[in-house]
């Protein structure tokens, strides 16, 4: 029997004015706040004000323009957005589309995901700090609002702490304001940039890629190739753009990106013109944390611009926080990470909250702010990890194109072209390792190590489960039938449920049958064996059943999308009613009940917990991985919470985890005289 379950199906994202506003608020927060620090980083890297000329500025904005065009527009908007999994995007969604091609593709998926999570920890810190630094030296009624970096740090910490605190309540209410605010922000970027650019239209020659390439070898560029480490900051939000596709739809991104891109480019060009016209003003050399974004604005509107920039930075941070929840949730469903407690604070699709992730992100942000102290120092660490994610995405995109039978020249050309560019960006960003990049590299390594232990440990366990530990349900049909009708044993429950994995339609781990028959015979009317299969599609909600020709044994195969909540208790109640309606199971009328005409009896769920047995035969590295995986289970959410059984009647039983074939040692029986003839131990 196959059927569908009630679920939140994927919505068709219509292209409307409201949807476009939502897109601005959800998708572009990261890339939209880049003008706050990109030109600042480029100028500081070359020695600051007075250490560059017009050609340097033209080459810099030319590099920014072509980076946005090649990486963001061509790779992500035109190519990657077409590689969607039922409308969902991101590196894990892309992996699910190609994982059948080769087993090793799990590695680039985990590396890319770990790097993306690590870099996301830095984004809230750098964007909010940069915005608040704009308040330094600003006068209100003759008083300086903020006059030192210590005050910047405290204000930043308060804002970020508040942002993480409100996550548990859901952000749908304030989220409705994100779109309009970001529309105002991008419009402000474009208008401010256009006004500055109008003072010197010759800056438009930067659209010629010659100036970009020339700057890389120009003596005016003191950073050489490493200037690309700062240029790359302009496109770090491209990966988030792809990951957030499922929230807004491809069409809304297609239509909104040109406007966003134009506003960004205008602002970068405007900053370049202002820098060119003010490069010789020595007074700017005395400004700590000099930022051309704020300095090019008239004093009269600077405070309003700082407030708007702070709101944009908060929205960008919120997008990264929500994206991290989604990324971790997908990793859990793909068995890359241990099961964690996930809360759905609102009824909105895709809005979730993971307490442990929220706490880790918050503490990481505070540690980063306390360690680096200034946005300039943070920029030195920013962007290194995301280059790795982009390289991994390119590799998976190549596999996707091959799986869709794209011409070999197109697939290979895409791989070579983008890999070459992103490798150059990676090399240029590698210098950041010594200037703080080691922080994100270390975080990414820790996340990757956890992913590797969990995923590879699970594979070792599955590959080494000895066949003798599996048993056919057919072989025990008669015993289960006799037990359910045996009056010598009290009824344990009406419906007894085991969460398991059934192989070849009828093989289950023998420990389950041992739990039913040997440990303490559990008499029930129906024995349920439930398997949850996570599908490559995000919102699948289907099931199949097999009763093996009985009315007391049911094999349930649940097929749930990798973004679906596993509410097994709720789903089983629908399934049993479906089966009773079809005549596959008899009704279970209850004599004592508060529910009139109740036809379904009580349920008990038995959850088995594994502990590594001393008899396990695997050795060395594999045994260490298994032991590490079992330790990770202590931080994981309980199976009852994971399967949606918090309020159900559950029984926990511990079983030994035996991997590999156990050698059988045969004892020789001695007669009494032979035993007495044995030499005695001198120590006794």
UniProtKB/Swiss-Prot annotation:
It is a multi-pass membrane protein. One of its GO terms (cellular component) is plasma membrane. The chain crosses the membrane at residues 19-39, 61-81, 104-124, 151-171, 177-197, 223-243, 255-275, 303-323, 352-372, 381-401, 407-427, 433-453. It is found in: Cell membrane. It catalyses: K(+)(in) + H(+)(in) = K(+)(out) + H(+)(out). Keywords: Cell membrane, Ion transport, Membrane, Potassium, Potassium transport, Symport, Transmembrane, Transmembrane helix, Transport. Disulfide bonds: none annotated. InterPro entries: K+_transporter (IPR003855), K_trans_C (IPR053952), K_trans_N (IPR053951), Kup (IPR023051). One of its GO terms (molecular function) is potassium ion transmembrane transporter activity. It comes from the Bacteria. Transport of potassium into the cell. Likely operates as a K(+):H(+) symporter. Belongs to the HAK/KUP transporter (TC 2.A.72) family. This is Probable potassium transport system protein Kup. It comes from Lacticaseibacillus paracasei (strain ATCC 334 / BCRC 17002 / CCUG 31169 / CIP 107868 / KCTC 3260 / NRRL B-441).
């Amino acid at each position: 029997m196959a059927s569908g379950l009630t679920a939140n199906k994927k919505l068709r994202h219509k292209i409307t004015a409201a949807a476009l506003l939502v897109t601005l608020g959800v998708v572009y927060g990261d890339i939209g706040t880049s003008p706050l620090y990109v030109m600042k980083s480029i100028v500081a890297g070359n020695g600051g004000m007075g250490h560059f000329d017009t050609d340097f500025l033209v080459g810099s904005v030319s590099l920014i323009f072509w980076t946005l065009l090649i990486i963001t527009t061509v790779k992500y908007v035109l190519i990657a957005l077409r590689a969607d999994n039922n409308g969902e995007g991101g590196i894990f969604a892309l992996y699910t589309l190609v994982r059948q091609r080769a087993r090793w593709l799990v590695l680039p998926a985990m590396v890319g995901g770990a790097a993306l999570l690590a870099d996301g920890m830095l984004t809230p810190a750098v964007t909010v700090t940069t915005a608040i630094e704009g308040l330094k030296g600003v006068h209100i009624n003759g008083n300086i609002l903020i006059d030192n970096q210590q005050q910047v740090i405290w204000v930043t910490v308060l804002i970020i702490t508040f942002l993480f605190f409100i996550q548990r309540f859901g952000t749908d209410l304030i989220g409705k304001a994100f779109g309009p605010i970001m529309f105002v922000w991008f419009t402000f970027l474009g208008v401010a940039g256009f006004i500055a650019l109008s003072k010197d239209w010759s800056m438009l020659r930067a659209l010629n890629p010659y100036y970009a390439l020339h700057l890389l070898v120009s003596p005016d560029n003191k950073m050489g190739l490493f200037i690309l480490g700062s240029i790359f900051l302009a496109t770090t939000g491209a990966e988030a753009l792809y990951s957030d596709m499922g929230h807004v739809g491809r069409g809304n991104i297609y239509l909104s990106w040109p406007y966003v891109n134009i506003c960004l480019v205008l602002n970068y060009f405007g900053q370049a013109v202002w820098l060119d016209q003010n490069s010789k003003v020595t007074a700017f050399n005395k400004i700590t944390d000099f930022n051309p974004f704020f300095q090019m604005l008239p004093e009269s509107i600077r405070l309003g611009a700082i407030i708007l920039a702070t709101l944009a930075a908060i929205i960008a941070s919120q997008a990264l926080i929500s994206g991290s929840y989604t990324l971790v949730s997908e990793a859990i469903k793909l068995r890359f990470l241990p099961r964690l407690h996930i809360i759905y604070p609102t009824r909105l699709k895709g809005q979730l909250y993971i307490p442990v992730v929220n706490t880790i992100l918050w503490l990481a942000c505070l540690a980063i702010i306390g360690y680096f102290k200034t946005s300039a120092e943070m920029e030195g660490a920013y962007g290194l990890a995301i280059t790795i994610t982009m390289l991994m995405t390119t590799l998976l995109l190549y596999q996707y194109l091959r799986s869709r039978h794209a011409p070999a020249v197109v697939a290979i050309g895409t791989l070579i072209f983008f890999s070459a560019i992103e490798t150059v960006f990676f090399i240029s960003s590698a210098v950041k390792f010594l200037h703080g990049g080691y922080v994100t590299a270390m975080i990414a390594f820790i996340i990757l190590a956890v992913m590797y232990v969990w995923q590879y440990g699970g594979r070792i366990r599955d590959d080494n489960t000895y066949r003798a530990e599996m048993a056919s349900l057919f072989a025990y049909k008669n015993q289960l039938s006799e037990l359910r009708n045996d009056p010598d044993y009290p009824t344990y429950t009406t419906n007894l449920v085991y969460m398991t994995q059934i192989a070849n339609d009828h093989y289950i781990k023998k420990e389950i049958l041992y739990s039913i028959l040997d440990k303490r015979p559990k008499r029930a009317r129906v024995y349920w064996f439930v398997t949850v299969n996570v599908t490559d599609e995000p919102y699948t909600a289907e099931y199949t059943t097999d009763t093996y020709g009985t009315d007391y044994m049911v094999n349930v195969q649940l097929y749930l999308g990798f973004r679906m909540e596993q509410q097994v208790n709720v789903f089983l109640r629908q399934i049993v009613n479906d089966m009773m309606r079809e005549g596959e199971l008899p009704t279970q009328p209850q004599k004592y009940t508060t529910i009139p005409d109740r036809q379904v009896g009580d349920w008990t769920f038995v959850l088995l917990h594994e502990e590594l047995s001393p008899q396990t035969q695997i050795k060395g590295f594999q045994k260490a991985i298994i032991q590490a995986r079992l330790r990770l289970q202590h931080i994981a959410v309980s199976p009852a919470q994971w399967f949606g059984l918090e309020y159900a009647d559950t029984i926990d039983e511990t079983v030994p985890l035996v991997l590999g074939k156990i050698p059988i040692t045969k004892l020789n029986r001695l007669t009494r005289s032979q035993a007495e003839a044995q030499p005695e131990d001198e120590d006794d």
